[in-house]
A protein has these predicted regions:
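Acidic, His/Gly-rich catalytic cores of divalent-metal-dependent hydrolytic chemistry
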Residues: 187-196
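Phosphate-handling substructures
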Residues: 66-125, 166
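Short, active-site-adjacent cap segments at secondary-structure transitions
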Residues: 11, 58-60, 80-81, 148-150
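Active-site-proximal alpha-helix that buttresses catalytic centers in soluble enzyme cores
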Residues: 5, 9-70
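Domain-level recognition of soluble alpha/beta enzyme cores
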Residues: 160-185
Length: 196
């Protein structure tokens, strides 16, 4: 079984700043979110066998809190989208070209200097193919970031037509997918009724 989680909250998240490759630590709220996610897994009887994490500290720490005794592997393909010159931009007052992109991810290309969404999907897809057999036999947790996670969900749902790009994925939201007959199932949000 495959579980994909977005890292817990950071100060940049709280300040509504565009956070891509900036290596920000979890804040107290983010640590609490990761602890809550660990409790959710425990309450559902899910034991994580292995963790794959983005190299950024917020994703690594989220994974450590959720699965402290599981094998952990860092994979650079799980890093967040490269926002280039827009890194750190205030999302309450984005540049016009970024606003156009955010309003229509499917038809408007990423602004110059920003990683194209097709590249995010390609690297996440490459990673998912590499662990497919392992995910059929073990409970695998992927600790990553919002846009990288959306790239994985887009890859796993070929007929989504870009619907995940506009979907809000909150800190420590979890999606799950199985491997059946050698293929990934469509991912579903792991929702135990908690308030969002």
């Amino acid at each position: 079984m495959l579980y994909i989680i977005r890292h817990g909250k950071t100060d940049m998240n709280a300040k509504m700043l565009m956070q891509g490759r900036s290596d920000q630590p979890l804040n107290d709220a983010g640590i609490g979110q990761a602890e809550e996610a660990a409790s959710r897994f425990a309450a559902m009887g899910i034991e994580i066998d292995k963790v794959y994490s983005s190299p950024l500290g917020r994703a690594v720490r989220t994974a450590e809190i959720i699965a402290p005794h599981s094998e952990r592997v860092i994979d650079g393909r799980l890093i967040e989208m490269d926002y280039g010159p827009y890194e750190g931009m205030d999302l309450r007052d984005p540049a016009p070209e970024v606003m156009d992109f955010f309003e229509d991810f499917v038809n408007v290309p990423a602004p110059d200097g920003m990683e194209p969404l097709s590249d995010v999907v390609a690297r996440m897809g490459s990673f998912l193919e590499d662990i497919r057999r392992e995910a059929a036999e073990k409970n695998i947790l992927i600790s990553t970031h919002a846009i990288a996670m959306k790239g994985a969900l887009e890859y796993l749902t070929p007929d989504s037509h870009g619907s995940y790009w506009a979907k809000n994925i909150g800190n420590c939201d979890i999606y799950a997918a199985e491997v059946k007959d050698g293929k990934y199932t469509v991912p579903v949000i792991l929702d135990d009724g908690r308030e969002r």
